[in-house]
Amino acid sequence: DKRVAESLHLGPADRVIRIERIRLHDDEPILYCIDYVPRSIIPSRPYDLDWSGSLLNLLEEYGNRPRMSAASVSAVLLPEDVVERHGLKDFGPALRITEICFNAAGAPVNYAIDYHRGSHFSFSLTRK
């Protein structure tokens, strides 16, 4: 995907790890997440890792904890293929946050697309 490669500064031969998760609250889906991480920053075999916990902690374990990010927010509906594949027809409107996270050296370490269920989240923003 060109957008992922550009966001993570990947070359044509570089590999990426894609993590797709649904986060629940009281057994109800409230967050649909897609994260992309450059394969080069995770030296372990992907199948040997526990992906169910915090991605930030995992990145920190390998010396790449995000220190800052650039994000955009928009009101959307979940993509239809996601709704059908995961049975999320009742998810409703969402706030999509698209974000690039950078480590302390300024290198991109995560490209994330998160869909926050509109009925369960509110955000406060400070703008300059």
Each predicted region: which residue ranges?
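C-terminal all-alpha effector/ligand-binding and dimerization domain
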Residues: 1-128
